[in-house]
Amino acid sequence: MEVILLERVSRLGQMGDTVKVKDGFARNFLLPQGKALRANEANKKKFEGQRAQLEARNLERKSEASQVAEKLDGKSFIAVRSAGETGQLYGSVSTRDIAELLTAEGFSVNRNQILLNQPIKTIGLTNVAIALHPEVEVTVTLNIARTADEAERQAKGETLTTAEAIYGDDINDNARPENFFDPNAEFDGGEDNA
């Protein structure tokens, strides 16, 4: 199906372009979201009549997104999650979780705007891209940790996936790797085996 784009759509084209897309993509996404019109003569005339209005609306949305991007760019957000000693999360941090975190901080971000290839499954610092507008993209840092104290330590550059990093000096000496029993070591005990 051929459609006329009413705004810039990534990987398709700019506003006003006539592009050929699959029927399902047009029917289920582009047309209901108001991002495109079917490419026929009546709609082409309608688009040309509204072009200036659409461009002004697009420019207004872009300037609003740019203002939010200035406030958001480079900011760091902390997500506290439970995780194992190796840093593996019990669960994951998805686009929905990130959107809720940003909304709680006062930024209006939809989960569809967060560009994340796969959910985050380990603790640490992660850069996340957010598309506030098709032409405005911003990157924020997500600090995923077990506690707020750990998040501060991670922000300073510490790696928190070892037992010493997690427990500090409180770790039991017998739990240190060098004190583990080695079954291949020579036994030099006081007992004689006959």
Curated annotation (Swiss-Prot):
Any GO molecular function: structural constituent of ribosome
InterPro entries: Ribosomal_bL9 (IPR000244), Ribosomal_bL9/RNase_H1_N (IPR009027), Ribosomal_bL9_bac/chp (IPR020594), Ribosomal_bL9_C (IPR020069), Ribosomal_bL9_C_sf (IPR036791), Ribosomal_bL9_N (IPR020070), Ribosomal_bL9_N_sf (IPR036935)
SUPFAM superfamilies for this protein: L9 N-domain-like, Ribosomal protein L9 C-domain
GO cellular component terms listed in the entry, alphabetical order: ribonucleoprotein complex; ribosome
Coiled-coil regions listed in the entry: none
Key words, A-Z: Ribonucleoprotein, Ribosomal protein, RNA-binding, rRNA-binding
Region (Disordered): 169-194
Gene Ontology annotations of biological process type: translation
Pfam families per UniProt: Ribosomal_L9_C (PF03948), Ribosomal_L9_N (PF01281)
Top-level division of the source organism's lineage: Bacteria
PANTHER family named among the record's database cross-references: 50S RIBOSOMAL PROTEIN L9 (PTHR21368)
Record-stated family: Belongs to the bacterial ribosomal protein bL9 family.
Function: Binds to the 23S rRNA.
HAMAP family: Ribosomal_bL9
Protein name, entry field: Large ribosomal subunit protein bL9
Organism: Mesorhizobium japonicum (strain LMG 29417 / CECT 9101 / MAFF 303099) (Mesorhizobium loti (strain MAFF 303099))
